[in-house]
């Protein structure tokens, strides 16, 4: 640890530029004192004067070392963050959390739980390679040459454009953001948006649109295709890890002020297919439409008796280890819980399991359908639950929810299952009612009719009024019965007895069993159907909303002010807001057939009507100029070159100034992708900024942790709307707004007399909404004089650029301010862990149905193949977007994983965690395969694939490095499968030398150690430069690549 610490401090010896934190006096004089301060404070313990146990040295916030955003307790001395622990007020980080009304002075001695990443977040903030100043490329894109420029100059150049690179010999007139911001009139935007909706619904023709809007057609990208939207859409904001609060701030800028539809997150690189499959499988049917749905229900681990895990590393990643480990471990220790894990790799949780089944990657649906067959054959499904066709029927049978298992589905002449049959089609009701067979006769069903209690027959295959119909459970049965159990076992790579044993155990605990799954099951081209099959397993035992079953999160108090009586309804506090409209660059949320670009099949690129934030589609679409060109892009907290499968193929697009004439990044470092842009504006780390993240999927009570600045910002300051503030993403967006003249920022941004001049003017309103509660009588207490003094003293080290108490108070009313202080003193608002249940049920329920059939999916087509999707789970092999089989000849199947101490990029700075515990990753092989290859631990091997036959990782226009890693031999992986973890093998983030203002900044070799698997992943041969993807859920494929391995 001493050596690691000395390495960390010594960075100042070769970082000479003040553009980086390591070249400043702060690092040179501040960080060595951390070591001295630690030693000094240890001496204090015996004298009971330990400064980190004083309430005035504690601030509460929210982590961002992974997506979970744990509630954290930050301990500060002399303005320096010294220690990070879990917040004991929050049920996220202390199982039996402290009473919310307990004084922070009394809570100071109690710490909550936190993982290694969270505790190492100190080094994320104090990374010597952090950017402080704006830098502009001083050579071609990707040359590694930079120069610092004044903030105001950078804003002027990106807003006004022009020949802004003439000083380095480039003669290109670049359009500035003001030139792209063409549609400015809110009334015109609203009228056009409404009419584009009509075009989409085939209620208006393009000619009619053009005639109606003839005076404003010049604002459109293409008047012959008005559904592409205005030229404003040619500005793209692509973001990676971002949380609530900051999401709304950036959407306010991109969508509502600039009027672009292109706010694109990175979710398809994470769990989007899982999210969307659960949303559609838990929707309500209201006023003739399927609506709502819950993004990621999870097992109630505190009460589950049998947990079946597919492709989820519960103790190392997921949502997240801090929340899941304790109840699972308690269950194993007490004997309450039995676990089975279906995963090619022996994960930490698999090592504790009753059964570990090393499945073939991508064949989760085969295993699940084998289970479904066994469950149906042995009648181990919950008949009563599945038969309930209305909410009243469920209530009458003491069930908290019901299903659509009996809602009849029309079967077309070609055998395709289509939409649900409606009552009007056979003359027994309306078009908003479904049909079930009840007591041998068809009956009309309105699911939410409070006077209707109907139970339907589960297995139906008949004709009604000449219409062929089947029930959803019948369709699922037919798919499950399409193969013998032995065949399902062979496909999945499991033993038939394992399927039988697990099926029996799964159906032996009533409602207290659950299937949990994540990336390993769904990051495949067939990921949607894998996920849907696993969801159906939960539905078959009717475990939704029961203790020990599948449940909703506890949620929280609304931060956006959409509840009655809340003081700041943020959606309404934006005068002259623009109406965004048009097809996003990713074609997400649109059916190809409803666009004016429809020309039959295949489409030029995939469309994703059921997904969103399709990150891997962004840059290939930009490269192809389809559906339109992007003129300016701003990237934040996202690294497409590192995080995308096959991301290196996008390098040519990033380097091409014709493809994206203006490329900007907001980043804390010169990263693996931001190194290729034109300008980098420094951003704040999570210890210096605001957000209202929301809670983990695994907590059953309300949680609203608040991210707030706990250390002084380490970026330079800038003047925005007359206020001196730290340079950040928020400051950048506000400066652009000020320069361009966008609505929603500056004077009267929220309405007359309500300005948005500092980011706190926005974020404090969110906290005020949380303090107000969701209904009357839910106000938190107002801080008394003692708490007010504590608030002031605990913030004493923060400069006025982020903490100006007078200005903070001015943005709220006096009463709101006191309640906001009460919330901030505790790091958010938290319900008691005792508030999770109502009898045998989860208190905050999933409101919708358990849907076994998804008619909206069945009614849609693959935009490349033109074939319809299927509304129920089915087994599909791995295919490209055109539905060609992928049958590569590689000897090994490549998978990837995360370690508990690592995330994609930012943990490479964590000398106390990732770099101390495991400085590099490995090519992990089973001993059987190692013998075949004649390799041993530590041997170097070259890994190649069909899409990367030479094993080259392109990192610059004329530079690549080989995909070589060190071998690690284990027994806990399926023979024929090789695993390479992520978060290693960087070439930015301080890993390589760069030049700033003529000074060479030496890179640090340890940051580049290891092998990065993403350049090896299989690309779609029909879509140049795009990874294989799930056509429904939109997920990028991380587990469908075969590789060869050669000793070097």
Curated annotation (Swiss-Prot):
InterPro entries: Asp_de-COase-like_dom_sf, MoPterin_dinucl-bd_dom, Mopterin_OxRdtase, Mopterin_OxRdtase_4Fe-4S_dom, Prok_Mopterin_Oxidored, TAT_signal, TAT_signal_bac_arc
Enzyme class: oxidoreductase
Cofactor: [4Fe-4S] cluster; Mo-bis(molybdopterin guanine dinucleotide)
Protein name: Selenate reductase subunit A
Pfam families, per the entry: Molybdop_Fe4S4, Molybdopterin, Molydop_binding
Textual note on the cofactor: Binds 1 [4Fe-4S] cluster. Binds 1 molybdenum-bis(molybdopterin guanine dinucleotide) (Mo-bis-MGD) cofactor per subunit.
Stated family: Belongs to the prokaryotic molybdopterin-containing oxidoreductase family.
């Amino acid at each position: 640890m001493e050596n690691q610490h000395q390495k960390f401090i010594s960075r100042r010896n070769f970082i000479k530029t003040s553009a980086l934190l390591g070249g400043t006096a702060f690092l040179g004089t501040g960080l060595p004192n951390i070591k001295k301060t630690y030693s000094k404070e240890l001496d204090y313990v015996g004298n009971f004067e330990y400064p980190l146990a004083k309430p005035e040295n504690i601030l509460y916030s929210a982590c961002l070392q992974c997506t979970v955003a744990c509630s954290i307790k930050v301990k500060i001395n002399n303005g320096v963050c010294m220690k990070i622990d879990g917040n004991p007020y929050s049920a996220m980080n202390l199982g039996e959390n402290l009473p919310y009304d307990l004084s922070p002075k009394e809570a100071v001695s109690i710490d909550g739980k936190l993982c290694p990443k969270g505790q190492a977040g100190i080094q994320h903030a104090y990374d010597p390679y952090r950017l402080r100043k704006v830098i502009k490329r001083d050579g071609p894109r990707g040359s590694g040459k930079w120069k610092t420029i004044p903030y105001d100059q950078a804003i002027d150049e990106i807003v006004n454009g022009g020949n802004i690179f003439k000083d380095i010999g480039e003669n290109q007139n670049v359009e500035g953001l003001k030139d792209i911001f063409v549609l400015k009139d809110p009334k015109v935007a609203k009228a056009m948006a409404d009419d584009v909706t009509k075009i989409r619904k085939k209620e208006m023709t393009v000619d009619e649109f053009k005639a109606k809007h003839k005076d404003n057609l010049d604002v459109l990208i293409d008047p012959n295709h008005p559904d592409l939207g205005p030229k404003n859409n040619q500005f793209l904001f692509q973001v990676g890890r971002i949380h609530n609060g900051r999401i709304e701030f950036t959407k306010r800028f991109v969508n509502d002020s600039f009027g672009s539809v292109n706010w694109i997150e990175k979710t398809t690189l994470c769990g989007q297919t899982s999210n969307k499959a659960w949303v559609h499988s838990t929707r309500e049917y209201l006023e003739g439409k399927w609506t709502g749905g819950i993004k990621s229900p999870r097992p109630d681990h505190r009460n589950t008796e049998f947990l079946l895990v597919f492709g989820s590393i519960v103790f190392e990643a997921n949502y997240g280890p801090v929340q899941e480990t304790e109840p699972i471990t308690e269950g194993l220790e007490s004997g309450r819980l039995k676990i089975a894990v279906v995963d090619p790799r022996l994960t930490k949780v698999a090592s504790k399991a009753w059964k570990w089944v090393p499945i073939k990657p991508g064949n989760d649906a085969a295993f699940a359908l084998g289970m479904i067959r066994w469950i149906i054959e042995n009648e181990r499904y919950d008949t009563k639950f599945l038969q309930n066709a209305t909410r009243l029927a469920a209530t009458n049978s003491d069930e908290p929810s019901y299903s659509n298992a009996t809602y009849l589905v029309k079967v077309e002449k070609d055998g395709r299952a289509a939409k649900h049959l409606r009552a009007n089609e056979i003359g027994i009701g309306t078009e908003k009612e479904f049909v079930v067979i009840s007591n041998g006769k068809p009956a009309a069903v309105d699911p939410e009719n409070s006077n209707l209690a109907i139970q339907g027959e589960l297995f139906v295959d008949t004709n009604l009024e000449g219409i062929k119909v089947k029930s959803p459970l019948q369709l699922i049965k037919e798919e499950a019965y399409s193969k013998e159990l032995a065949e399902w076992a062979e496909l999945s790579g499991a033993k038939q007895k394992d399927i039988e044993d697990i099926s029996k155990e799964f159906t032996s605990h009533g409602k207290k069993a659950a299937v949990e799954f994540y990336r390993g099951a769904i990051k495949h081209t067939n990921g949607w159907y894998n996920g849907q099959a696993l969801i159906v397993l939960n539905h078959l035992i009717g475990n939704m909303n029961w203790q020990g079953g599948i449940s909703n999160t506890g949620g929280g108090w609304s931060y956006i002010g959409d509840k009655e009586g809340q003081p700041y309804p943020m959606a309404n506090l934006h005068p002259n807001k623009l109406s965004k409209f048009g097809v996003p660059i990713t074609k997400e949320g649109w059916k190809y057939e409803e666009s004016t670009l429809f020309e039959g099949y295949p489409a030029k690129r995939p469309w994703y009507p059921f997904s969103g934030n399709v990150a891997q589609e962004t840059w290939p679409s930009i490269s192809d100029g389809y559906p339109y060109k992007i003129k300016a892009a701003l990237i934040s907290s996202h690294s497409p070159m590192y995080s995308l499968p096959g991301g290196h193929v996008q390098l040519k697009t990033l380097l091409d100034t014709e493809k994206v004439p203006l490329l900007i990044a907001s980043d804390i470092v010169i990263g693996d992708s931001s190194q290729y842009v034109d300008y980098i504006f420094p951003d704040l780390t999570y210890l210096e900024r605001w957000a209202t993240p929301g809670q983990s999927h695994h907590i059953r009570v309300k949680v609203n942790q608040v991210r707030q600045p706990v250390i002084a910002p380490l970026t330079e300051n800038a003047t925005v709307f007359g206020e001196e503030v730290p340079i950040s993403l928020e400051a950048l967006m506000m400066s652009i707004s000020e320069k361009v003249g966008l609505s929603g920022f500056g004077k009267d941004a929220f309405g007359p007399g309500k300005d948005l001049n500092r980011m706190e003017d926005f974020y404090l309103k969110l906290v005020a909404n949380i303090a107000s509660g969701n209904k009357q009588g839910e106000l938190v207490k107002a801080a008394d004089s003692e708490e007010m003094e504590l608030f002031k003293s605990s913030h004493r080290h923060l400069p006025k650029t982020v903490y100006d108490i007078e200005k903070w108070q001015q943005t709220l009313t006096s009463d709101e301010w006191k309640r906001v202080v009460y919330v901030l003193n505790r790091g958010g608002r938290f319900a008691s862990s005792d508030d999770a249940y109502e009898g045998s049920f989860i208190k905050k329920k999933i409101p919708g149905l358990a849907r076994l059939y998804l008619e909206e999916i069945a009614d849609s087509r693959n935009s490349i193949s033109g074939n319809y999707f299927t509304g129920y789970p089915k087994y599909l092999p791995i295919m490209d977007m055109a539905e060609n089989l992928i049958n590569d000849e590689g000897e090994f199947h490549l998978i990837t994983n995360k370690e508990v101490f690592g995330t994609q990029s930012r943990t490479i700075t964590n000398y106390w965690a990732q770099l101390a515990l495991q400085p590099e990753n490995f090519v992990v092989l089973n001993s059987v395969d190692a013998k075949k290859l004649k390799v041993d631990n530590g041997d170097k091997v070259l890994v190649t694939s069909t899409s990367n036959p030479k094993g080259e990782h392109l990192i610059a226009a004329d530079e690549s490095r080989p995909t070589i890693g060190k071998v690690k031999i284990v027994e806990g992986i399926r023979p024929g499968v090789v695993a390479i973890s992520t978060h290693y093998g960087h070439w930015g983030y301080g890993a390589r030398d760069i030049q700033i203002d003529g000074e060479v900044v030496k890179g640090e070799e340890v940051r580049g150690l290891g092998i990065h698997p993403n350049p090896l992943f299989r690309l779609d041969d029909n879509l140049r430069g795009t990874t294989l993807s799930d056509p429904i859920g939109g997920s990028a494929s991380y587990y469908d690549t075969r590789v060869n391995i050669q000793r070097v």
